[in-house]
Structure formats: structure tokens, C-alpha cells
């Protein structure tokens, strides 16, 4: 496997793990008995098909959870101001396209680490103020694939500043932009 392929694979894997972690933090069950907390991507797609859920409602739910939990967890560095518009577009496509013609990630909100380039209104800073406001020339390869699959880029997840490419004595999970993040698994066990 080439280093570019390996890098893209590991970026995609970390994005998937972020989605799973975010889903595991949620504890809301919709009136129909559908639990977002325990939902897989397949469950979410089934809820979309059964009209139990829309991408807009899912994005609104995640944005609310980020608003509630992020001041403590500090896991999300920035949310995409266009996420709701992307969700509306996904809902419209779901209404007009043939069932089964959309990808499994269509309409699913996903966070990407802040060192993965997105050519949109989000910053790509690797957690550093030094890159705040810089403009990337294009989406990273993994983001191109996610967008093509219909995923909604919900925002940027924090990471150790410069993706931990600095002093080995620096604490993990710290960045100038994001502050010190918390270990989510431990917090979940304590709640």
C-alpha cells in the first residue's frame, strides 16, 4: 500500500471512529423508539427511508449535542455554517432520487480532523492559531470521497496541535485553538 493510500485510509478510519464516538455519546430516542445513540449508519439510512428521520433533524440533533457537550469535552473545534443547507440538499435528493441510488453515507453528518483540508468555510489549522484564516487550495482526497458519497461535513474535530508532531513531552489532546480535550470514553463511564 503506497503512503498516500495508507494516509487516506487512516484519515478515513479516524473520521469513521469520530462518527462512532459521537454517536456513542448521544442518548436521545425519537418518539418512534428509534435511538440515535445506538444507531449505525445503516440504522440511520433505514430511519431516513421510513421517514422517521431527516438529515436536517439529524444535523440539528448533533449541533445541539455539540453545543451542550463541547464546552466540557472540547472535541469539536468548529462547526460548518453550511451543514444545515447540506442536510436540506440531502433531504431533497432523497425525495427525488430512486431508492437505492444513493450511497450509504448520503445525508450522514461527519466530523473530520482539523488537519484534513476542506475547501469551504471551515478553517484547516492542525489546531494551531498560526494557520487560522489560511485558505486551502482544494479538499483532501478523503473529503472529496466523502462529499461524492453525499456525507455532510459537520465540522472539524480537535487534535493535538500539529497532529502531535512536536515535543514528545507535550500533553496529548492539547492544541492552541482547541485547548485541552477530555478522554470521552472515561467521561462516558462516569456518567
Model-derived regions, located:
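Alpha-helix boundary/capping detector
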Residues: 74, 88-92, 172-173, 179
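Short glycine/serine-rich loop/turn segments
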Residues: 105-191
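An N-terminal boundary/leader segment
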Residues: 2-89
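Acidic-residue sensor for enzyme active/binding pockets
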Residues: 86, 93, 161
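Secondary-structure junction/capping motif
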Residues: 54-55, 101-103, 140
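Immediate post-signal peptide segment of exported/extracytoplasmic ligand-binding proteins
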Residues: 90-109
Amino acid at each position: 500500500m503506497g503512503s498516500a493510500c495508507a494516509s487516506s485510509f487512516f484519515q478515513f478510519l479516524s473520521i469513521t471512529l469520530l462518527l462512532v464516538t459521537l454517536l456513542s455519546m448521544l442518548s436521545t430516542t425519537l418518539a418512534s423508539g428509534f435511538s440515535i445513540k445506538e444507531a449505525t449508519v445503516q440504522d440511520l439510512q433505514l430511519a431516513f427511508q421510513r421517514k422517521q428521520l431527516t438529515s436536517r433533524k439529524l444535523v440539528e440533533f448533533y449541533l445541539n449535542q455539540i453545543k451542550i457537550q463541547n464546552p466540557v469535552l472540547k472535541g469539536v473545534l468548529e462547526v460548518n455554517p453550511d451543514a444545515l443547507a447540506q442536510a436540506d440538499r440531502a433531504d431533497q435528493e432523497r425525495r427525488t432520487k430512486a431508492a437505492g441510488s444513493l450511497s450509504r453515507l448520503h445525508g450522514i453528518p461527519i466530523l473530520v480532523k482539523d488537519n484534513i483540508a476542506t475547501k469551504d468555510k471551515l478553517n484547516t489549522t492542525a489546531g494551531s492559531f498560526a494557520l487560522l484564516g489560511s485558505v486551502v487550495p482544494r479538499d483532501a482526497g478523503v473529503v472529496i470521497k466523502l462529499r461524492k458519497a453525499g456525507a455532510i461535513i459537520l465540522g472539524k474535530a480537535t487534535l493535538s496541535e500539529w497532529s502531535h508532531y512536536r515535543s514528545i513531552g507535550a500533553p496529548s489532546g492539547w492544541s492552541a485553538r482547541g485547548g485541552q480535550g477530555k478522554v470521552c470514553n472515561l467521561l462516558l463511564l462516569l456518567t
